[in-house]
Amino acid sequence: MMKFKNKKKKKNSRSYTLKGTVDHVNKKYAFIEIDEFSEDIKIRSRFLKGAIHGDKVEVKVFHHLSRKNLEGEVIKIIERKTTEFIGTIQDSKGFAFFIPKNKKVFVDFFVKKRKSEKFSKNKKYLAKVVDWGNSLKKPEAKIIKCIGNIGENETEINSIIYDFDLPTEFPSEVIKETDLLNERISEKEISKRKDLRSIDTFTIDPDDAKDFDDALSLEKKDNHYLIGIHIADVSHFFNIRTTINKEAEKRATSIYLVDRTIPMLPEKLSNNLCSLKPNVDRLTYSVIIKFDIDFSIIDYWIGRTVIHSKKRFTYDDAQESINNKNGLFHEKLNLLNSIAKKIRDKRFSSGSFNFRSNEIKFKLDKNKKPVEVYKKNRKDTHKMVEEYMLLANKLVAEKIISIEKKEKKTYPFVYRIHEDPEESKVNELKNYIKQFGYTINTNEGNLANSLNGLMKEIKGKPEDRSIEKFAIRSMSKAIYSTKKEKHFGLSFRHYTHFTSPIRRFPDVMVHRLLSDYMNESKPKEKTYYDIMCKHSSKMEINASKAERESIKYKQAEFMSMFIGKKFEAVISGVTEWGVYAEIVETLCEGLIKISSMKDDHYVFDSEKMRITGRNNKKIFRLGQSIRVKVIDTDIEKRTIDLELS
């Protein structure tokens, strides 16, 4: 059998204390996430002792022989995640109550009012906690300011920003330091690098991109090809001791909400100095790969370079040039695309996953209201650029391994790892697809290829999307780590992130470490990189959650125009409280509450992920096509209510 990720064993003692972070699931209970412990601790709300979502706490853990989960109680609140919230106000004479609108905060706050003070129920406010209260006294907050009207774009997006504690403005010290950066590249700096300015280099990015952190080049020689993958040399502009670096460390990633980007770096760096804009010299870190005439890799070189991009393509521009075989660099684009396809085929045959992207995009009007929802169409040019970025990341990781072997030393480094899925998750997937007549091979070395075969088999069938979603949820989460472990999803022995330093701090760390180790520097202290890998992984997850909430908000806003309308839909989730369905035409997901299904009493089957009518025996399961009617939307809660039609 395949080797699955092992769960750590529970401690043997009946009672002990641990430190962790509160994940408040609902009004009844929360889980405490313990970093060094594989199993979360369940805490019933009455034992939280005033702790709320995100707080760091110390808990006393105890075992219930009759219960499956470890349970416990909070004995100390070590650190509050935040003291500020966005919410609404229930106004009364002489006092008011502030109700946070964060979905994971289940406490309201007493507000003292001045005599003339009035609050509107149709507005959202920012409040600061002044007293956390106790068992005898309600917590108290003061109102800082009005954020805006409920349902307006700025109000709702700011709610998401506060809910996920996202950064907004850069500190003045960071801006001052950035303003002092020199835009001119000195001849001395150029002399330290491989000069590639005469080579035809170009970028390929989305239409609305402002920061271009990667470029490609191709040179055809007599019996081989040289492909250059050129990445913005972000680490050249600030060192580890600067305030720019401290802020980038803290942010760790750029965040892409539907209507805005919250960048990791100030605009002068992200959109100007580091951006590989056309017709200007730019400092880069390059991976130059030598291919033979059969498109197999012969050798590669990694080092600091200077380039001069000759053209800024959009993905559409580049695709049109490939399709029509005309325009600037069309021969190079076609050859790059052909080589990328061969690399991709080889990667998939080696066990790399071929999950399809279902990225949702919105067209917004001048007031940032959604007027169209559509699925991002992945063209050959998207896949081509992605393939070269994957290859560069892989080769950089392999370079570090080769340095270690040569020097016979361990060099701490930042890897991107993806663990094997847990056996229980794979078995759940196997049981789920069995009802559709499919199976997968879980023997060691066969799971990835078997999953790719499954994806081909289900393509175009009604259960297609639901099985793919289930399969993705069965996988472990890719993280940053100093451990030299494989990337299961890509089927790479070693992998890192090198190609997006404008928007990811781990890539900045990789550039620095790579440069030091290639210049025969001593191995770095591992502790800092352990801390930063953990922090970067955490911030990546937080950014993803915020991005998803902004999508849900815009979906609810868009569907508010279609209340009473009927649509074809596919069941995308089944729970004990209802059925989630994705509307085919708009890609928006809503909930059909079981309480609204009046024709029978429906029973939830968690193993088969379906509900069944007790009397009529009707079955509703993942992947099933149904017809729904839009009943209501709640823009504030970011939800869509549906009923069967």
What spans do the regions from the language model cover?
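Short boundary/loop segments of OB/S1/cold-shock single-stranded nucleic-acid-binding domains
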Residues: M1-L18, R44-H53, E58-T83, A127-K128, ...
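Structural detector for short beta-strands of small beta-barrel domains
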Residues: K10-K27, I75-G94, I563-W577, V628-K629
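Electropositive polyanion-binding surfaces
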Residues: R14, L18, K112, K118-K121, ...
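Short, conserved beta-turn/loop elements at beta-strand boundaries and strand-helix junctions
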Residues: D23-Y29, H64-L65, E79-T82, S92-G94, ...
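Structured, charged N-terminal subsegments at the starts of enzyme catalytic cores
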Residues: Y29, E84-L126
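SH3/SH3-like beta-barrel fold
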Residues: A30-I34, V59-V61, F97-P100, A127-V129, ...
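Beta-strand/loop nucleic-acid-binding surfaces
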Residues: E36-A51, N102-K118, L587-I619
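Short peripheral tails and domain-boundary helices/loops at the edges of structured domains
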Residues: I75-G94, K145-E169, L257
